[in-house]
Amino acid sequence: MKLDYTRIIGLVVVGISITVIFGTMLPQNDMDYSENLSEPITENSNPLIVIVAPSIHEKYYKEVFQEVIDYDVMAVNAMYGKDDIILLADKATIGYFEGRVPDEVLVTSNVVDIWIRDFGTVNTTTEVKFEYRPQYLSVSESDWIDESYEDWFSARELTSKKTDLILDGGNLVFNGQDKAITSVRVFADNPQYSQDEIDQMLKELLEVTEIAYLPEEEGDITGHSDGMVMWVEYDRLLVNEYKEPFRTQVLTELEESLSDIEIIEIPYVFQEGLWKGWPSACGYYLNSLVTENYIYVPVYGLEEDEYVLELIQSYTNKEVVSINAEDVCFMGGSVRCLTWTTDGTDANKILEFAEQN
């Protein structure tokens, strides 16, 4: 894919500034739908990043075990010293990291899957545990994964709101203040509720005032929004530079749903390939992990990597840090998919446990 990086056009549409970088009142109800066990996240608390290693005993990842371990080592070392971070691994696997990452980040745990973003709590200014029951997994598979996380979560005495709404963490992108983005998959996953009911429930649960519901990318199994968009600042949103007519569908939804933001289109490089039926995520730069002071951006060994890193850096005061995701992106996910973050009291509890152990 050859990109022409010289053409930049600024647009203003219904109060939203859109920079294009060219390449080649709702009904009320009284439903009790959540259990509020969440402690407020303090405004300036430091984020804690959590990564989960694959188990040496897990057959599903057997053929890519070493690649994922190597990626985890690289990612932990790149993030260590910038943000608080821990790496969860079971007893049989933790030895693969000893001497390769700082000892204090290693925590023994039996969380069974690496894609913790999807089944972990969703963190805005509060913390919400959604039902993990995605279309792309069987009920037994999703229950097995979710129960392992819930066991770990409750053992640490962590707190969150709980709801019966089905939503993957990878399908919620929060701007840090009052806006969130998901996809229309949330409507399909929760047919027992109307779209207006879901919108109201999400705004109350997440404590936001505006939500955009993006159309799904063609061929995307997950229906996630976190490979499509990324907030680099609370009022500045990066969006993949899609082809028409999908581009207009995405931009129209963002323009009509979110106020007072700047939208910037960023090149991405679609890569063919399937792994166990999962389309590759290689070339998707917006599946980045954003924290208070850093943006960890995946790179893929592509000629566009350096340009996109510089471009993202030009739109944010946060420091952009590259993370080589070549060892994992072919499995259908990238940097954000493989991390979970929490703040405040829960982060402190996890760090205290890690220090004691």
Task: Give the ranges of each region predicted by the language model.
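Histidine/cysteine-enriched polar flanking segments
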Residues: L3-L11, G15, I21-N357
